Amino acid sequence: MAPKGKDLTRKVYEIICHRWPIHPSGICRIIGLELTVSNISKIKYHFDILKQKEMIHTKQIDRALVAWPAEIDKIRVVHEMMKGI
């Protein structure tokens, strides 16, 4: 059985951290949810919560929404600064 509420938000964040970049349907597959519009929308809702808390970044690529941890952008900035040295 899939987690619900805050447990699902936490699980979605863990999956994003370990398998980024990822989209909602990929998370549905990992959790074991059937790929329906309803379940994909449910995962997207948790993407929105995590984005509002600034824990992840998202980008719309054509019709696909892709997410990755916010920490990755921090690493990218440090990498860019080190290239300049």
Predicted features by range, described:
Residues 1-18, 39, 78:
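Short alpha-helical segments that sit at the start of domains
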Residues 3-6, 60-82:
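Short, cationic-aromatic polyanion-contact patches
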Residues 14, 29, 45:
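DNA-binding alpha-helical recognition surfaces that contact promoter or target DNA
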Residues 18, 49-52:
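The C-terminal cap of the DNA-recognition helix in HTH/winged-HTH DNA-binding domains
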Residues 22-31:
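Short acidic, hydrophobic short linear motifs in intrinsically disordered regions
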Residues 36-49:
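Short amphipathic alpha-helical interaction segments
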Residues 51-61:
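A short, conserved structural fragment
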